[in-house]
Amino acid sequence: MIKRVHLGQGKAEEILDLPNLIEIQLNSYEKFLQLDRLKNNKPLLNEGLESVFRDVFPMKSSNGEVALEYEKYYVEYDSLSFTEKECKRKGQSYEAVLKIRLNLQFLTTGEIRQKDVYMGTIPLMTDRGTFIVNGAERVIVSQIHRSPGVVFYKEKDLYYARIIPYRGSWLEFEIDSKKDYLYVKIDRKKRILVTLFLRALGLDTREKIIETFYKIKKIEVNEDTKREITGQYLAVNITIKENMTYRAGDKITLQDIEDFLQNGVKEIDLIDFDGYDSVPGKHFISSDVILNCFEKEDAYFSLKDGFKELSRESVMLAVYSVLLPGEPISIDNAENDLRTVFFSEKRYDLGHVGRYKLSKKFGLNDLTTSVLTMTDIVNTISHLLRIYDGHDVLDDIDHLGNRRVRSVGELLTNIYKGAMSRVEKIAKDRMSNKEVFNLKPQELISVKPIVSAVKEFFATSQLSQFMDQVNPLAELTHKRRLNALGPGGLSRDRAGFEVRDVHYTHYGRMCPIETPEGPNIGLIVSLATYAKVNDYGFLETPYRKVINGKVTDEIEYLSAIDEEKKCIAQANAAVNAESNYIDDLISVRVSGDYTTMIPKNIDYMDVSPRQLISVSSALIPFLEHNDANRALMGSNMQRQAVPLLFPQPPIVGTGMERIVAKDSGVVIKAKRSGTVVLATSKRIVIRPDNADDEHDLDEYELAKYERTNQDTSFNHSVLIKEGQVVNKGEIIADGPATRYGELALGNNLLVGFIPWNGFNYEDAILISERIVKEDLYTSIHIKEFSIEVRETKLGPEKVTADIPNVSGKILNKLDENGIVRIGTYVKPGDILIGKVTPKSEGDITPEFKLLTSIFGEKAKDVKNNSLKVPHGTEGTVIDVQRITKNDVGNLPPGVDEILKVYVAKKRRLKEGDKMAGRHGNKGVVAKILPVEDMPYLADGTPLDICLNPLGVPSRMNIGQLMESQLGLAGKYLSEYYDVPVFESATNECIQEKLKKAGFNETSKAILYDGYTGEPFENEVMVGIIYMLKLHHLVDDKMHARSTGPYSLVSQQPLGGKAQFGGQRLGEMEVWALEAYGAAYTLQELLTVKSDDMSGRVKIYENIVKGIPTNVSGIPESFNVLMQELRGLGFDLSIYDDNGNQIPLTEKEEELINKT
């Protein structure tokens, strides 16, 4: 165990401990499967799988005679064929059988038939938050998407209100500010006037519409009020004579008033535009946009003044023709259809989130209605018109109140919902088509749609990803990732700058630093350290409550919506022993503004300075002294650090290292307190303190050199001794890239910031040979090679050491079965598994046919189809596995067995490997220098690494200098430090430590040249820096081709290492050779070394025979060009110097030869 010294400016202990870092995965899946609640038979009815089955059942047959009812579901743990480890080894999925109990009820007779019906298998989550699918660990990444609900926004001159449901048709309102009309769009189809839409939904008269949206005032009609009334709008129809009606919404003229007076109208109802705010709880409007829509209606239907209302038929016709153009219309059907689009639970679902958002926006208390109501539509229109008039403000689409997170559970629920709707359709068909009394529950349910949907989701969904397993931090970050892409999300090409940008609501919820560089920047982000997802899917972050200027220890989690307009102080605001603020003015933030406030006005206080960043950013010491771009690179590169054989924990840490190791799931923790009985490299046994009997022991299997998804090595090493007492939760074995239970991604090295003979030009790194000799950066990489033994039409393939036409020397690494021996060192081209395949009759010569007929099967020829070590790979065989049908029961069709060989290679640090610090300071090893040639300190200590000082000023990552200084002090004082982010050690503190260690307080020292022994002219900054070796190793990239595959059409060599391809000689390379007049070099590069087929063969012949050569024919690409032109209709022929035609195809050659 390491004892760390806390060097932060704040207190060592936090107010609130970090939550379990992978709880977003674990909680979401538990909510989906509800295994704990199932045991007590009390699952929540509106969550996860339970809600899926409750939505679909009961099902009734069309004739009403039979009903299929659902009782409960359960997961059969006994059906688990393999453990997690076996699944990985045998390429199987870790899943259990799902069954549901159904009752088939005959309504006429009352008979009930009960059956537990198989519903396919369901992948189970491991305690590390991953799934094992076909032997590989996968992670379901959480998706961040637009929240259902209502949103108001503006684009160009158009104001929009959009009601987004969880499932169903989108409803969009838009105001065209140039024309002052309000339109409705359903599912982005053509526009409909809003008044027509309202009439179709039941507000069928002008009076009803006006009464809904406007405050109405009564006014007497007399000579005194004439002037006041003129130009105002009627709110209620006035009928004077039989054929004389003044309609609500019409403008009143002087002539109209005269008519009123003559006909004895004493009082009229007018629209009160000014009183829109005078009635509490009512959202009245002051805009005349709706009245303009009445005018537009009149023009549309050619109505004259004095005519009555629009008929129901004409309204429905107008609306329905836009919804379903070209469909025959009956008025009742049209009305039904329109109502079911928004008001029926089958077709429309706001989801509890959508309803919550609508109620929050309009101040309603309803949290249960899942469909739209007329009130929602009226409120939305009123709010949009109030925004248009400037009485309300637009929404911010990128506000985290308008974006929510869908985690594993919800994604899976949606998959099951889609599949179950297909199951329901099939079941209903079967109910009506089969003989009723012969029905059985299991015959009605078809499992295929469910099985295929779940399989497809886990295998191919954009959100189901191959786990990044390079190191524990990479695993952890992958599980905490938020992705805006994927089904129902954004697309990379259409996402603009605003969506990707940092928003003030991200504070404490999403990390502003950690995101990929490149096209996905800002679309893939990381969860902040303390963030949680609430029941509605909104991100929440914790705050300490402040009451009357006094800070309490009460913690409240707030979502972005709740946090709006609250006044929040920073975590490092100075507080005295009585929890009162020391300063009179405190630095705070309110929404997006940063200001100062008196303590009395403060509502909340941050929990910790690191709450606004993600886990990997919180591992960077002195983060606040780095430029954010470099911090981003530092966060991303820590995830690429390869686990080393002998890692060390960083001398300068941030206090997060232990937490990351503990929550990542790679270390082994004690389940119960007890005494260690056995501790070997493969197994630990602990006798718990509260054991039930002597056989009640806790056993732990340790992983030894297992392969990860990224071909790194997964290995456990024991941290305890036999007889030792351990506590519950204590770390008893280290995993990859952990040391003493802490994350240890690299090593501490003695660094000098000094240029050295140009070897560290442009970020290159100069390294001492000591590092290589002592294996400080040696890592183990394990590759898996597999081969299938198939049943062919000509007979089975065989695994054997008896391979035709192969020398005994090559076969001496195989055992008698034809499988390579464990422990053998293999090189490229070596045979790992000898396999022969029967040859087809077509390949056999007449002589062989004769022998076969004489000697029978024995003489049948076979083809060598052995598994060989590919180019660029060598290493030691550490394991061989044979998987047969007896082992797993379901190999792919036609496959008898699968053989896997694991080859491990120890990779030392070498020139070309990429290294990096934690501050985005990356570089490639340019030279490994003998220890005696490295620059050394006055006491003779040689440096381990030389970095270029020019890599610091322009990159603005000063954190690396501060880390080096403090690391130097720590090394000589034998101390390890915790330097939490945003409250790191001050310069004074670092200088004090340096003095204590006996160094100059700038940590600059005189260095001596290893070649000459002379001191360098100036003092050099020296320190201890933590460096990582990244997963960009030169061994994986180094590639050379002699002869290899060619592309079929162009006959040019393929490209890339995977295809064993060649180097591309492009347009610009040709210019370079032309500039030097290197005609012959250029000719051979463009012909015989590329795609001159006949020339290639000829030159090979000449080289073998030793004849001086200068052959070149016509490159194949020229022929391709010619054929391309012929395809366009040009008849082209080519001729040589002597006027003879050169054939381009074999057909042409024949023709020319004939003539």
UniProtKB/Swiss-Prot annotation:
NCBIfam families cross-referenced by the UniProt entry: PRK00405.1, rpoB
Subunit structure: The RNAP catalytic core consists of 2 alpha, 1 beta, 1 beta' and 1 omega subunit. When a sigma factor is associated with the core the holoenzyme is formed, which can initiate transcription.
EC number: 2.7.7.6
Record's keyword terms, sorted: DNA-directed RNA polymerase, Nucleotidyltransferase, Transcription, Transferase
Catalytic activity: RNA(n) + a ribonucleoside 5'-triphosphate = RNA(n+1) + diphosphate
Pfam families in the cross-refs: RNA_pol_Rpb2_1, RNA_pol_Rpb2_2, RNA_pol_Rpb2_3, RNA_pol_Rpb2_45, RNA_pol_Rpb2_6, RNA_pol_Rpb2_7
Keyword Transferase: yes
Gene3D superfamilies from the UniProt entry: 2.40.50.100, 2.40.50.150, 3.90.1100.10, DNA-directed RNA polymerase, beta subunit, external 1 domain, DNA-directed RNA polymerase, subunit 2, domain 6, RNA polymerase alpha subunit dimerisation domain, RNA polymerase Rpb2, domain 2
PANTHER family assigned to the protein according to its UniProt record, in alphabetical order: DNA-DIRECTED RNA POLYMERASE I SUBUNIT 2
Summary of the function given for this chain in its UniProt record: DNA-dependent RNA polymerase catalyzes the transcription of DNA into RNA using the four ribonucleoside triphosphates as substrates.
Assigned GO CC terms: DNA-directed RNA polymerase complex
Species in which this protein is naturally found: Borrelia turicatae (strain 91E135)
Secretion signal span: none
Entry's Gene Ontology BP terms: DNA-templated transcription
Family named by the database record: Belongs to the RNA polymerase beta chain family.
Record InterPro entries: DNA-dir_RNA_pol_bsu_ext_1_sf, DNA-dir_RNA_pol_bsu_external_1, DNA-dir_RNA_pol_su2, DNA-dir_RNAP_su2_dom, DNA-dir_RNAP_su2_hyb_sf, RNA_pol_bsu_bac, RNA_pol_bsu_CS, RNA_pol_bsu_protrusion
GO MF annotation list: DNA binding; DNA-directed RNA polymerase activity; ribonucleoside binding
Protein name from the UniProt record: DNA-directed RNA polymerase subunit beta
Encoding gene, per UniProt annotation: rpoB
UniProt KW Zinc-finger keyword: no
